[in-house]
């Protein structure tokens, strides 16, 4: 009597169905640490092909958020892929440690306690180290393989000295200057801001149309009126429009476009000048229905005419500027060189300079109009309206909601404010034209990044690099007390400072005096107390790779890749590009990838106010880092990325699909020893040869998608391979021989050999993304020589590559197309409850001669392809009326009959009664032969 269960090779494995990632991942991290994985990956690899990804430094403040996780995971996927492709790809994580946010946190902690600057910097430094350690541990928990023992902080002495060394090169080129210019200014920061430190949000403002009365002069008389009429001149006003009424006291000119046409319009007894295209729009707003056009003229004709300020006792000129548009307002713009960059440029041509009547806190300081003194510019705009009404200079006003710049840290409105600052000149020596040409040669992903960078650089003013703060890298300049000029030996002095800072840090600058560095005429110079823009620091850090990796070709070092969020076009990408082009005349990167922002399920940005933040730490604790990594890879990260608990659950389903496939593969090779049981390729069944060739094909496509950084397509291919090629096809077709044939039969060992190879492929495919799961798989694989999956490369078996199956992919594609068509008919019969299982079927095929001969090749194995108990082939012409015609295959009809034969309790096939042994546990002759290894050998499957 045969024990049926014991006679079957039922699948079993130690590889768990439940991943328990949150626990298992920590074990794997300990293993990586124990074997010193990062060092092992890079030991003796410097002669390999090289790939350098430059880390955009996150800010050393607070817990990592989901955006940090996206960024670091993407970088990690790329670097793991590159290392598995044979590249030397080191990764040194960087951190930005200076800047306002840290200063403000320390100021809040200190409250009103006063300490000196030296102590303040020490406290900032201690805080930074704690933050970096916290973030570092969070990044390690994500599975990021990096040189965690050699991280790069902007506070490192080498970084401080390198930043000043780069600045010295720019000074040497004569591109640094000091000027009184309008820059972004935050009242709370009490400092200038970089463009990358502002964000635009909607703000309610008062928009006003103001009358600036023209002063009678000969230009008007000679140009426009033959008959001089003093009454008309006394009543002509030029209308200006502004959304910043607080700037009216600082107005020093009115700009019009020299090439556009303006009109003098009569309304009742008054005359107004405004641009031709906007006349109707302006008067409609003020509900004016009747007006008369007196004359038209080009803007250039009234240059230098003067107007009265609407309430200050001053006269202001009309000037020309091409930036004035006919799309908005009146075509006349009041010019405040203190509070607008375009205003400053236009006024500079007429030698009109800023007057600085708004202080650093936002209060007016006007000698000529004391009513506004000590009033904050944002709090008393209504006061300006009142004054204008009182002086009968307000033509019209309304409240509008418009996009306005805000401080990214304080979330409060900022202004342009003229202050003495240090700038890098970006206008000299065709700098922008040369940079445009280099931008074209860089690979931008997405491609729109190229035009975005070009547009931003085109309109970018000179770079303000000075900040009026404490916590930062110093601007080590000495300026003349009277002239404000840099010391003539500045470059030489800075080179000395660089050497000292490399050994002692920048404290040596802060704690020194003028005499330390200048011996002659030291009493006529003073130290600059400003610090450098943090974007200059991070922009200069690409040159540190040279020192960290001992790169031989130092002069021409270029990073292969920069990868950051899309906001970094105006931030780190731009600062790095400018610095590299100035100092080395080459871009710092060959490729730039940007990822989108993380949104919630409703498409809203993550924010504290909306309470929609999802912490990466909580996701890891609940689901594991591999789920988070899979979510990052699964989405097209070049767009904004959505996350929610529902989305993560869908990602978990996809993870289970991959894991269950791998578990099933393991369960079918539980008794397989590669060194004993492996079957040579040429002796394997043709179906097994097919799946190996198919797997190789998938690997080529997957590697290509990895190399194109299209990870969502990598994942889709892996899932497709697991679900379709394996789940719906190969693994279904081999079940019979896997379970029912003798455990040492060539048929079974052949499919086990194929499964063994598939696992070798699959574990490598998922490794860059599902790093912990891949390591878990690797630990259970036989014949592994390396301690970690990441110490291997893409699977290449010479025996498999050289050999080609007699029955190639095209051959099997044809048979699987037929199988797919037949399955449609079988599924219909299942739905109709005619059958429960396809093995109940006798399949009758009525087919054309060509197809008949093709299927005849399979002989008795045909039923195993269609997973039925019996298959019969007939000529197409003999098809009965009940046979159903295929819609996809020509001359192809199918008839399905339910078998009346007996079901074998072991293999579940239906066979004739006389094919069974007459005993209590009757099993079919096929099963007996399989057990005794006397069966006819399979060729195909």
Swiss-Prot record:
Q: Where is the signal peptide?
A: none
Motif 'KMSKS' region, chain ranges: 605-609
The residues the record assigns to binding L-isoleucyl-5'-AMP are: 564
Q: What is its main location?
A: cytoplasm
Which residues are noted in the entry as ATP-binding?
Answer: 608
Keyword Cell wall biogenesis/degradation found:
no
Protein keywords: Aminoacyl-tRNA synthetase, ATP-binding, Cytoplasm, Ligase, Metal-binding, Nucleotide-binding, Protein biosynthesis, Zinc
Segments carrying motif 'HIGH' region: 58-68
Q: Where in the cell is it found?
A: Cytoplasm
| GO BP field | isoleucyl-tRNA aminoacylation
Report residues binding Zn(2+). Answer: 904, 907, 924, 927
User: Which superkingdom is the protein from?
Assistant: Bacteria
Q: What is its EC number?
A: 6.1.1.5
Q: Which Pfam families match?
A: Anticodon_1, tRNA-synt_1, zf-FPG_IleRS
Its biological purpose is as follows: Catalyzes the attachment of isoleucine to tRNA(Ile). As IleRS can inadvertently accommodate and process structurally similar amino acids such as valine, to avoid such errors it has two additional distinct tRNA(Ile)-dependent editing activities. One activity is designated as 'pretransfer' editing and involves the hydrolysis of activated Val-AMP. The other activity is designated 'posttransfer' editing and involves deacylation of mischarged Val-tRNA(Ile).
State whether it acts alone or in a complex, and with which partners, per the record.
Answer: Monomer.
User: Can you tell me which family this protein belongs to?
Assistant: Belongs to the class-I aminoacyl-tRNA synthetase family. IleS type 1 subfamily.
Identification of the protein by name: Isoleucine--tRNA ligase
């Amino acid at each position: 009597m045969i024990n049926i269960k014991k006679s079957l090779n039922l699948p079993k494995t130690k590889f768990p169905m439940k991943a328990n990632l949150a626990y298992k991942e920590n074990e794997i991290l300990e293993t990586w640490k124990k074997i010193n994985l990062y060092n092992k990956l890079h030991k003796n690899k410097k002669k390999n092909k090289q790939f350098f990804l430059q880390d955009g430094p996150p800010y050393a403040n607070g817990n990592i958020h989901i955006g940090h996780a996206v960024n670091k995971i993407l970088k990690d996927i790329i670097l793991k892929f590159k290392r598995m492709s044979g590249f030397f790809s080191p990764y040194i994580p960087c951190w930005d440690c200076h800047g306002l946010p840290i200063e403000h946190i320390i100021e809040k902690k200190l409250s009103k306690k006063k300490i000196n600057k030296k102590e303040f910097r020490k406290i900032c430094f201690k805080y930074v180290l704690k933050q970096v350690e916290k973030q570092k541990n969070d990044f390690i928990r994500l599975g990021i393989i990096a040189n965690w023992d050699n991280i790069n902080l902007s506070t490192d002495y080498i970084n401080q000295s390198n930043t000043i060394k780069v600045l010295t090169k720019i000074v040497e080129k004569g591109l640094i200057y000091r000027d009184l210019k309008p820059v972004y200014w935050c009242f709370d920061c009490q400092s200038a801001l970089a463009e990358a430190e502002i964000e635009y949000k909607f703000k309610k403002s008062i928009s006003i149309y103001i009358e600036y009365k023209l002063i009678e002069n000969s230009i008007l008389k000679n140009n426009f009126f033959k008959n001089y009429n003093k009454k008309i001149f006394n009543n002509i006003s030029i209308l200006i429009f502004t959304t910043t009424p607080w700037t009216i006291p600082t107005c020093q000119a009115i700009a019009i476009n020299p090439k556009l046409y303006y009109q003098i319009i009569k309304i009742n007894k008054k005359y107004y000048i405004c641009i031709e295209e906007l006349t109707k729009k302006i008067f409609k707003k003020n509900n004016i229905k009747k007006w008369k056009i007196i004359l038209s003229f080009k803007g250039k004709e009234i240059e230098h005419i003067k107007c009265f300020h609407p309430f200050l006792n001053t006269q202001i000129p009309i000037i020309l500027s091409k930036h004035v548009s006919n799309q908005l307002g009146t075509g006349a713009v009041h010019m405040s060189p203190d509070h607008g960059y375009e205003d400053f440029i236009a006024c500079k041509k007429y030698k009109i300079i800023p007057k600085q009547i708004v202080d650093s806190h936002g209060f007016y300081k006007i000698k000529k109009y004391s009513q506004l003194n000590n009033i904050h510019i944002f709090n008393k705009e209504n006061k300006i309206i009142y004054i204008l009404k009182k002086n009968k200079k307000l033509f019209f006003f309304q409240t509008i909601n418009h996009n306005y710049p805000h401080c990214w840290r304080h979330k409060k409105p900022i202004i342009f404010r003229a202050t003495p600052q240090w700038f890098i000149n970006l206008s000299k020596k065709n700098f922008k034209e040369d940079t445009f040409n280099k931008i074209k040669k860089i690979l931008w992903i997405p491609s729109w990044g190229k035009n975005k960078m070009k547009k931003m650089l085109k309109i970018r003013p000179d770079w303000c690099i000075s900040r009026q703060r404490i916590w930062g890298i110093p601007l080590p300049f000495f300026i003349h007390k009277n002239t404000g000029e840099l010391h003539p030996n500045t470059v030489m002095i800075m080179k000395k400072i660089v050497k000292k800072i490399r050994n002692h840090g920048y404290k040596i600058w802060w704690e020194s005096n003028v005499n330390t560095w200048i011996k002659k005429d030291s009493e006529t110079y003073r130290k600059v107390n400003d610090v450098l823009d943090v974007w200059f620091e991070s922009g200069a850090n690409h040159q540190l790779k040279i020192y960290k990796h001992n790169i031989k070709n130092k002069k021409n070092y270029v990073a292969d890749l920069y990868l950051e969020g899309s906001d970094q076009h105006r931030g780190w990408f731009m600062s790095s590009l400018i610095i590299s082009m100035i100092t080395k005349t080459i871009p710092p990167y060959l490729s730039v990838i940007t990822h989108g922002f993380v949104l919630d399920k409703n498409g809203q940005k993550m924010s504290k106010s909306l309470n929609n933040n999802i912490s990466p730490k909580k996701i890891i604790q609940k689901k594991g880092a591999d789920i988070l990594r899979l979510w990052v890879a699964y989405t097209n990260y070049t767009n904004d990325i959505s996350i929610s608990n529902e989305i993560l659950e869908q990602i978990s389903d996809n993870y289970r699909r991959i894991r269950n496939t791998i578990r099933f593969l393991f369960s079918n090779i539980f008794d397989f020893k590669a060194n004993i049981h492996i079957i040579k390729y040429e002796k394997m069944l043709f179906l097994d040869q097919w799946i190996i060739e198919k797997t190789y094909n998938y690997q080529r496509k997957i590697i290509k998608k990895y190399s194109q950084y299209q990870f969502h397509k990598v994942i889709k291919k892996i899932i497709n391979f697991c679900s379709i090629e394996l789940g719906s096809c190969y693994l279904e077709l081999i079940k019979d021989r896997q379970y029912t044939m003798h455990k040492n039969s060539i048929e079974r060992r052949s499919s086990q050999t194929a499964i063994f190879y598939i696992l070798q492929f699959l574990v490598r495919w998922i490794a860059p993304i599902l790093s912990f799961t891949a390591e878990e798989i690797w630990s259970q694989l036989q014949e592994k020589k390396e301690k970690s999956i990441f110490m291997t490369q893409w699977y290449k078996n010479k025996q498999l590559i050289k050999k080609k199956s007699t029955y190639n992919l095209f051959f099997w594609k044809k048979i699987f197309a037929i199988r797919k068509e037949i399955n449609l008919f079988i599924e219909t019969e299942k739905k109709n409850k005619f059958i429960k299982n396809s093995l109940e079927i006798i399949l009758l095929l009525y087919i054309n001669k060509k197809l008949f001969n093709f299927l005849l090749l399979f002989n008795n194995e045909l039923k195993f392809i269609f997973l039925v108990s019996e298959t019969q082939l007939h000529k197409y012409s003999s098809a009965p009326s009940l046979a159903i015609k295929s819609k996809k295959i020509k001359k192809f009809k199918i008839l399905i009959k339910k078998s009346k034969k007996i079901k074998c309790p072991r293999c579940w096939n239906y066979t004739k009664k006389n094919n069974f042994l007459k005993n209590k546990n009757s099993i079919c002759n096929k099963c007996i032969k399989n057990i005794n290894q006397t069966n006819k050998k399979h060729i195909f499957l």
